[in-house]
């Protein structure tokens, strides 16, 4: 498990046809469609609350905390129309949150705030599988060394 920092962003509808992942710094024009309006933020907030392990944050933020077997993840919605996802976790809960929110609004992408890459559902799933393979390899090596 690693510390993960993401933001969920709206992209222009034509961007959904682009090849993901891509780096925002390499785009000649912004693929982002701007901040979420309050009505959409409310719908995303409600959808997040339907996730397993989701509990309303008690720290005054409009946020959810997911305490999963794979780690802890916070999802919060800001008054300026942003959505942030961060925590110490595997990528599986991040994918679950993103997939749930895509059901509400299909014009979403996940921005990795550490690398600057923008992911759609398929590229994030590839990243999840790669992450799982690394973990499996670590356990295989450890088991082989112990034998």
Task: Give, region by region, the residue ranges found by the protein language model.
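Acidic (Asp/Glu-rich) sequence patches and key acidic residues
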Residues: 1-147
